[in-house]
Amino acid sequence: MMKKRQMVIKQRSRNSNTSSSWTTTSSSSSSSEISNVRYVECQKNHAANIGGYAVDGCREFMAAGVEGTVDALRCAACGCHRNFHRKEVDTEVVCEYSPPNA
């Protein structure tokens, strides 16, 4: 019996208005989904109180502390909360299936 492996990689952004979906049908298949979350550029508007728009240029979130502490949600580079950074979710779907016997 020959096993084949199919990988589909999806990338979603929190600001994305589009959504995509897919379905896979097969006689005998199993799949698993692996998600990797990254927080990239800071989008905090530092000039909002004067009616302007200015970002600090921070390109990627780096936690200021270890996981489980309050500092884990603060960026070591810019000092902003993690929610000000754009969230990217990379989802990897791995499907393993065996073709039906002919």
Swiss-Prot record:
Keywords for the protein's UniProt record, in alphabetical order: Cytoplasm, Developmental protein, Metal-binding, Transcription, Transcription regulation, Zinc, Zinc-finger
Principal location: cytoplasm
ZnF (ZF-HD dimerization-type) intervals: 39-88
A GO MF label: DNA binding
Pfam families: ZF-HD_dimer
Chain intervals with Low complexity compositional bias: 14-32
GO biological process, one term: photomorphogenesis
Gene Ontology cellular-component terms listed: cytoplasm; nucleus
Tissue: Mostly expressed in roots and stems, present in siliques and seedlings, and weakly observed in petioles, leaves and flowers.
Comp. bias intervals (Basic residues): 1-13
Compartment list: Cytoplasm
Top-level taxon in the UniProt lineage: Eukaryota
UniProt-annotated stretches for the region Disordered: 1-34
Function: Inhibits zinc finger homeodomain (ZHD) transcription factors, such as ZHD5, by interacting with them to prevent both their nuclear localization and their DNA-binding properties. Involved in integrating signals from multiple hormones by preventing the expression of genes involved in gibberellic acid (GA), auxin and brassinosteroid signaling and by promoting the expression of abscisic acid (ABA)-responsive genes. Regulates several development aspects, including photomorphogenesis, apical dominance, longevity, flower morphology and fertility, as well as root and stem elongation.
Subunit structure: Homo- and heterodimers. Interacts with ZHD1, ZHD5, ZHD6, ZHD7, ZHD8, ZHD10 and ZHD13.
Protein name as catalogued: Mini zinc finger protein 1
Organism from which the protein derives: Arabidopsis thaliana (Mouse-ear cress)
Source lineage: Eukaryota, Viridiplantae, Streptophyta, Embryophyta, Tracheophyta
